[in-house]
Amino acid sequence: LYRNNAQSRLIEQYLTANAVPYRIYGGLRFFDRAEVKDVTAYLRLLSNPEDTSLLRVINQPPRGIGLTTMERITQEAQSRGVTLWQCLTDWQQDPALVRRAGAFVSIINDMKAACEGLSLAKVVEVVLEKSGLKAFYEGKPDKDIRLENMGEVINAASGWYKENGIEEDAPALDVNEDLGMSPLDGFLSQAALEADDKNEEEVRDCVQM
């Protein structure tokens, strides 16, 4: 049905919108691919720093915050009854961890500041650069596929604006009166729908990709 992985996104979107079951053989759905999940995780943090997506990207790309460190942060947050983000912003127990955690918090805060007033497609571009994801995947053997998929997220963002009748330069982080939410949240809701696990079930009559 398609020539490359990135092209599958439009087909998946159409099938999901029309409640047509499908299966992808030998691959993952677009929004389930690692690099795409990384991008959407950062987007979710822009929308809500308290989101659990923090666990996915706090060390992606690698920045010295491994599993053991994350367990410490998680335990500390639970013991204090605060969120992971709150715990990161005021961690004082370990100077080395304070530096690493502070650097991550700064990345997210700077990213959000840079995205104020930008359209969704531009927001994705900022995320790719400021998160370090683009540079990280450029160093991978399969960089062409990875970068193409991340670039397709930009196309998906632009397409989502058109499909929902949103002005091309409408700010992604501001609440849209017609939508009742920000364009960013609307896009993330659509991404979650397209990544729904129900399409992985065994269905006799389905589109095979």
Which residues fall in each region the model found?
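Conserved phosphate-binding/catalytic loops in two-lobed NTP-binding clefts
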Residues: 28-31
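Conserved helicase C-terminal RecA-like lobe
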Residues: 5-21, 33, 40-209
